[in-house]
A protein has these predicted regions:
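Conserved N-terminal structural module of periplasmic/extracytoplasmic solute-binding proteins
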Residues: 2-116, 135, 180, 330-334, ...
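Short helix-initiation/N-cap motifs at beta->coil->alpha
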Residues: 84-97, 113-114, 188-195, 264-279
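Hinge/lid segment of periplasmic solute-binding proteins
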Residues: 112-165, 194, 304-308, 376
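Periplasmic solute-binding protein
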Residues: 120-122, 144-184, 216-236, 318-325, ...
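Short, solvent-exposed loop/beta-turn-alpha elements that line the ligand-binding surface or hinge
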Residues: 129-140, 183-190, 230-250, 297-302, ...
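Glycine-centered hinge/linker elements that transmit conformational signals in sensory
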Residues: 197-201, 237-267
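Extracytoplasmic/periplasmic substrate-recognition and gating elements
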Residues: 259-260, 297-360
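C-terminal capping/gating helix-and-loop segments adjacent to ligand/active sites or protein-protein/ligand interfaces
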Residues: 378-432
Length: 442
């Protein structure tokens, strides 16, 4: 993932923290939101050169992996300028304004997964249909589906994804008398997050002093929801959050955690959560691929060799983005070629090697190589294989236009009411319901 975390927390805080997770906050001329102050499609770069502008948020890793320089060496007539905005919640409204105006867009615009449904439903005619210019089979089917309009236009090419695993402290498991082998653990909770909760109950019987099984109930909710077939909307864009089987199952698993003693009751990406890694106060966390670097950074040297990675109960996704070409681009042909090249399997593998952004192109998986230090940090776990297995079995989920704020209402209002304030699950659900009705204007 670039460094914008998209799903279940306050966006501003998330994006900034995610950038720290990879340690790759870009240095650039900044406006008031901490991003680049320039925008707009590229013009001539002098002496017949074409300047292509690429609008991104956070850190996509293209510059850091040397991809822009490589492309410009291969195409002497092309100059590339990246316009970066740190925060997604600042970036996307600006993009929408420019799309609606029909001018001022970059030649390539990044689209975060939390915004892709809005782009597909309300801005589809403002983007070029890229499906005519690429072999769509290069990307995961569910990834393409997220960026495809009802009339079949593919408005974005997949960049990274966030396949899920369980990262765990094997030293704490050993002290609690539990198996430490990643394969055995994966078998214990395979197919059901409630089985994961059952392992948590076993852990707490002999938990090392000062430790809990899991960081938060919201962590379990998001991971479980990401593996379900339904979220908050059906495929016809009808709101079904209060009837969704996926929401119900995820909520029940989260409540089993929130009403027990197994949660550290930490809010993800708050400073106390970071401190929890450093102090070793929780034994497991549901971890998408991009969180590997974050855990390594926050746990520090003392965590080396203590962390391990096992397959999650169900395949799930948290994160990912796309590259689209606005119809307002002055250089559509050249922009399409650059977008195709940046998202090709070979280039996605290079970005993974630089900052662990997991590719959305399966043909890249066989050659992926995480950093040697990272592999050792996580007890030589087959990280690439674990995440690849998850990536290829993730269910296709439909994201509605208010998907993100509904999710935040459930995690930051409903679940926290139970976990941190001692409310009953029914009271937490009622609190989330009130917040969601406000979001939906009901």
């Amino acid at each position: 993932m670039r460094t914008s975390i998209h799903r279940s927390r306050r966006l501003g805080a998330l994006v900034a923290v995610a950038a720290m997770a990879t340690g790759l906050l870009a240095g650039c001329a900044k406006d008031s939101d901490g991003g680049s102050s320039q925008a707009g499609g590229g013009d001539g770069g002098g002496k017949g050169k074409i300047t292509l502008t690429v609008g991104t948020f956070g850190v996509f890793g293209y510059k850091q992996a040397g991809l822009y320089d490589e492309y410009m060496k291969l195409h002497k007539n092309i100059s590339i300028k990246e316009n970066v905005t740190t925060r997604t919640d600042v970036y996307w409204p600006k993009v929408l304004t420019r799309l609606q105006a029909g001018s001022g867009t970059d030649d390539i615009q990044a689209i975060e997964v939390g915004n892709i449904t809005e782009a597909v439903q309300t801005q589809g005619d403002k983007f070029v249909d890229l499906g005519k210019d690429v072999d769509k089979s290069q990307w995961l089917g569910w990834k393409n589906a997220q960026a495809t309009t009802k009339d079949g236009k593919l408005i974005g090419l997949g960049t990274d994804i966030g396949p899920m695993a369980i990262c765990y402290r094997k030293d704490l498991f050993q002290k609690a008398g539990l198996p430490t082998d990643r394969t055995k653990l994966a078998e214990q909770w395979k197919g059901d997050w409630n089985k994961y909760v059952d392992v948590g109950k076993q852990y707490m019987k002999k938990a090392p002093a000062g430790t809990k099984f899991v960081d938060s109930a919201a962590s379990v909710y998001n991971a479980a929801l990401g593996g379900g077939k339904e979220r908050y909307y059906d495929k016809d864009d009808n709101v079904i959050w209060d009837k969704s089987s996926g929401v119900k199952d995820a909520w029940n698993a989260a409540m089993a955690v929130a009403t027990s003693d197994m949660s550290a009751k930490l809010k993800q990406f708050d400073p106390t959560w970071d401190q929890g890694y450093a102090k070793g106060t929780f034994a497991t966390v549901a971890c998408p691929a991009w969180m590997i670097g974050y855990i390594e950074q926050k746990s520090g040297d003392s965590g080396k060799g203590k962390w391990d990675v096992a397959a999650a109960p169900t395949a799930a996704n948290w994160g990912g983005s796309f590259l689209g070409v606005p119809t307002a681009s002055k250089h559509q042909k050249e922009a399409i070629e650059l977008a195709k090249w940046l998202t090709a399997p070979e280039q996605q593998a290079k970005v993974f090697a630089k900052q662990a952004s997991f590719p959305s192109t399966p043909s890249a998986y066989a050659g992926l190589k995480p950093a040697t230090d990272t592999t050792a940090y996580f007890s030589n776990a087959p990280i690439t294989q674990i995440f690849a297995d998850s990536a290829t079995t993730i269910p296709v989920q439909y994201f509605g236009t208010k998907d993100q704020p509904i999710n935040t209402a459930i995690t930051d209002v409903g679940i926290l009411q139970v976990e941190q304030k001692g409310k009953t699950p029914a009271q937490g659900w009622d609190a989330a319901t009130k917040e969601i009705k406000d979001v939906l204007g009901q």
